Amino acid sequence: MTSNNEKKLLTKSDINKVFWRSFTVNASFNYERQMSQGAQYALSPILQKLYPDKKELGEALQRHAEFFNTTPMLCPFIFGITAAMEEENATQEDFDPNTINSVKAGLMGPLAGIGDSVFCCLLYTSDAADEL
């Protein structure tokens, strides 16, 4: 259990930057890695803050170059968790950075299923029902 008195590296402003950048996640969509470049762009402010060393920053950016695809409207949720895990990785010696991508991959599918159902089906269906 961690103490609430621990000094956090990331501020609310840092998280807000990630939130606003997450809206551009689909801007660099490609068929090889889907939204990974958008994820890198969204997370880059916190990665630059957490890893001032160029080698560590390169490793962090490489970590987020892996395949990433989910409903774009739910990306801020995943990026918030990812930011917290990156902060733990930067401050804890015994943290395994492979868990960051494992958690991202574990959240992509379920959130895509929920997000697609809500944003792509339910909302359009209710809009079509209003037309009747």
Residue ranges, per PLM feature:
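Soluble N-terminal domains of membrane-associated systems
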Residues: M1-D96
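Short, surface-exposed, charge-dense and proline/glycine-enriched linear segments
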Residues: A84-E93, K104-P110, T125
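Alpha-helical membrane-spanning segments of integral membrane proteins, especially the hydrophobic core
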Residues: N101-C121
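The first (N-terminal) embedded transmembrane alpha-helix
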Residues: S36-G38, V118-L123
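Intrinsically disordered, low-complexity regions enriched in small/polar residues
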Residues: D53, T99-S102, T125
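Single conserved hydrophobic/aromatic residue that forms the stacking wall/gate
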Residues: Y124-L132
